[in-house]
Amino acid sequence: MTNILSPEKSENDQELPIRPSYLQEFVGQQQIKENLSVFIKAAKSRNEHLDHTLFYGPPGLGKTTLAKIISNEIGGNFKSTSGPAILKVADLAAILTNLEKNDVLFIDEIHRLNTAVEEVLYPAMEDFELDIIIGEGSAARSVKITLPKFTLIGATTRLGLLSNPLRDRFGIPMRLNFYNTGELKKVLNRASKLLDIDLTDSGSEEIAKRSRGTPRIALRLLRRIRDFAAVDGKSRVDKEISDFGLNRLEVDRIGLDSNDYRYLKFIADNYNGGPVGIETIAAALSEQRDALEETIEPYLIQIGLLQRTPRGRVITIAAFEHLKMPVPNQSHHQFNIFNENE
C-alpha cells in the first residue's frame, strides 16, 4: 500500500539532511528521551555497553532515528540491517563478527527473524558469544567465537509477533507513541529551517493536524505543500496554500485519505458498521492484512473511529458521523460487544 499518508519509509523521503543526530535535537517522545539519556550516561560512567534496546510502535515515529542517535551518543559505529535480510545463520555470523566494542547493531523488522537465526542471536546478546557449527555430518564441530560488547537495537511495528525468548532479552523496551499537534509543529518548524522553507505558524498547524500523528508523514506533506506553493508563485507556506495542497492530495481535515474512506465505508455499507473479520476486509479491498493492520488501523483506532473486538472490526458512532452516514440501530449493541469482551 503506497500513498502520501503511508507511515512506511519511502525512497523519496530524503530524511538525512533533517534527521536529528543527538537526543537534545529530537522532538517528541519526551519520556523515552529522558530515560535514554539516563541509561546512556550511566552506561558511559561505568564504561559499559548500553543494554540491548527494543523500540516498538507504529511506523514513522522515529525508531531508526533514535537508534542512530544512540550510536552517536555512545560513540560507536552504526550497523543497520533488517529481519528479512538475515536469511541464514551465516548472514548473522558475518554481521556479528565484524562488530567492534560499543558498536550499535540495528535490526529493523526484528519480528521477521527466522527461528534458526534467533537461536544463534540469544547467546550473542546474553554472553557475547557466537556458537556456530562448522562442517556437516560426523565432521561437524561447534566453534565458539567471543564477540565485543555491542548494543543490539531492535525495531518492530508488531510486538505481538516477537517471540517471548527474544523479547525477554532486551533490557530496555520502549514504546513510541503518536505525536500530538504541538509536537508535530515543532518537527515541521525545525525541518522548515533546515530546508529553507518559509513556513508560517498557521501553515505548520494545518499540516500538523492532518499528518496522522506521524513525523514522517508530516515531513512528506511539507515537501509536497512546498511544491504547490512554488508552482502557485507563493514564497511562503501558509494556511491557505497548505489547505489547498492537502485537499489536492485528498487528505481531509483529520488526516484521512481515500484508503481510510474505502476501509470505513466497506464496513459501514456492507456490515452496518461490523463486526467483520480482518481477512474479509483485506480480501474485499484487495490489500494485504499486514498493510491494513500496520498502515490504516492504528490511526483509526487512535482517533476513535475503529475498534478491534474479539468478533472482528467495528467502526464507531464517530466514524459514521465523520462519513456523514446515519448510524444503524444495532450500532449501540455492537459497541456493547466490545465492552463485554474486553
From Swiss-Prot:
Organism domain of life: Bacteria
MF terms in GO: ATP binding; ATP hydrolysis activity; four-way junction DNA binding; four-way junction helicase activity
Alphabetic keyword roster: ATP-binding, Cytoplasm, DNA damage, DNA recombination, DNA repair, DNA-binding, Hydrolase, Nucleotide-binding
Any one of the GO BP annotations: DNA recombination
Residue ranges of the region described as Large ATPase domain (RuvB-L): 1-179
Cellular localisation: Cytoplasm
Biological role: The RuvA-RuvB-RuvC complex processes Holliday junction (HJ) DNA during genetic recombination and DNA repair, while the RuvA-RuvB complex plays an important role in the rescue of blocked DNA replication forks via replication fork reversal (RFR). RuvA specifically binds to HJ cruciform DNA, conferring on it an open structure. The RuvB hexamer acts as an ATP-dependent pump, pulling dsDNA into and through the RuvAB complex. RuvB forms 2 homohexamers on either side of HJ DNA bound by 1 or 2 RuvA tetramers; 4 subunits per hexamer contact DNA at a time.
Domain comment in the entry: Has 3 domains, the large (RuvB-L) and small ATPase (RuvB-S) domains and the C-terminal head (RuvB-H) domain. The head domain binds DNA, while the ATPase domains jointly bind ATP, ADP or are empty depending on the state of the subunit in the translocation cycle. During a single DNA translocation step the structure of each domain remains the same, but their relative positions change.
Protein name as annotated: Holliday junction branch migration complex subunit RuvB
Organism ancestry: Bacteria, Pseudomonadati, Pseudomonadota, Alphaproteobacteria, Rickettsiales
